[in-house]
């Protein structure tokens, strides 16, 4: 980005891997989006012909892990006789700028340049037009990435969330990369029985040395497509036959356009404020549009809330944080009044959702799952050596399907209001803040863990203010003396014990977010095997 104030040394802390994965990936469960593509970078003169790649066994294997039904349908022959891999659109896309292409699902492309990462220059074989397309909207023709049922790098818990979405029948399925076995896949199926009701079963799909696939060695298949066809016709030992692929939501774009990928200070005139969603201490939140065609959320800050120079430095880091449980920062207007442009979440804040929205009717399994999503996002922040500083339900946003994402990470450090910077002033969130942070300004990822424990009480009480009946001064005094909130009504003892662990006086004794994520994701399934053996397989 073109701002000289950026802190290079701070930005260098962040790992700029395109899929958001990390070198220290133990416990990593979520990619930046549900269907990441890991295709090599290539230019127009050297596109490898993956569709004609052959293994020793003579099968038409692609390097993407699938077997082509035809070694020619996905290849464009050039005058020199070489093959160029064609890509197919998996979704419809409406162009946002004059630089990108509109296209429909099923449209085929020749890729001209993939050096821009998330945006590829391509030529449509339907219209002949050339422009940029989002790379996670396409896949190589005839590859498994182009199949409706293939979800790529999707974690077990997110697979369950998608399969258990309202309206999916028994037998809804998807195939994803195995989290535990490199090179293998997992088949996840929505099932139902009298005892458990709706639930998901997972089966490991293993690869043969010669490139085939199997769930049981007695039924082996050359391709994943053949495996799916076989189990679509009969259960053959699975919990039920495969009925319909799980619906894929639209992939998330981490930038507004190819141009804002690197230069994301945008003119105020490109934004339209349409509907005010909220009014806070330091500004307002609006639903709006960018360029008249892209729905976004716009946070407008009151002049004097923070220094534009400091904000730009922090935004440089925030822009690099990319995870599907974090609200994506798209762009900024850095002159006062500062505008922060992010992805739009249509259900609003978790606090309002619990108090006045659909959240009032949620049962414990849904509430624990929402907590697990927040923990997953915070585990990513933890791995990236970042700190939120203001973790509470008001700063969690909710979307369709009870999807939760963390917002406003890092901004609290920049606020210059005296009623906030005093840490015990009227605007400071004392009831969510760890004592070492409130008293001495020692904000760390462990003070975020304390705040997460408070957020858990907000979830199980449907948005009740913490420490009911106590003012900020009383809370600070009582917590210092060792007081901790008692177990809320209808809250399981084991969940309250987790809160107590988050509120340990010694920050180092508090759990990691990686631990919290695992604990909450497995809260109701800890006694079950992760993978089903299958019956009579």
Curated annotation (Swiss-Prot):
Detected in spinal cord oligodendrocytes (at protein level). This is Tyrosine-protein kinase Fyn. Autophosphorylated at Tyr-420. Phosphorylation on the C-terminal tail at Tyr-531 by CSK maintains the enzyme in an inactive state. PTPRC/CD45 dephosphorylates Tyr-531 leading to activation. Dephosphorylation at Tyr-420 by PTPN2 negatively regulates T-cell receptor signaling. Phosphorylated at tyrosine residues, which can be enhanced by NTN1. Palmitoylated. Palmitoylation at Cys-3 and Cys-6, probably by ZDHHC21, regulates subcellular location. GO terms for molecular function: alpha-tubulin binding; ATP binding; CD4 receptor binding; CD8 receptor binding; disordered domain specific binding; enzyme binding; ephrin receptor binding; G protein-coupled receptor binding. Residues 82-143 form the SH3 domain. Keywords: ATP-binding, Cell membrane, Cytoplasm, Developmental protein, Kinase, Lipoprotein, Manganese, Membrane, Metal-binding, Myristate, Nucleotide-binding, Nucleus, Palmitate, Phosphoprotein, SH2 domain, SH3 domain, Transferase, Tyrosine-protein kinase. GO terms for biological process: activated T cell proliferation; cell differentiation; cell surface receptor protein tyrosine kinase signaling pathway; cell surface receptor signaling pathway; cellular response to amyloid-beta; cellular response to glycine; cellular response to growth factor stimulus; cellular response to hydrogen peroxide. It comes from Rattus norvegicus. The lineage of its organism: Eukaryota, Metazoa, Chordata, Craniata, Vertebrata. A lipid is attached at residues 3, 6 (S-palmitoyl cysteine).
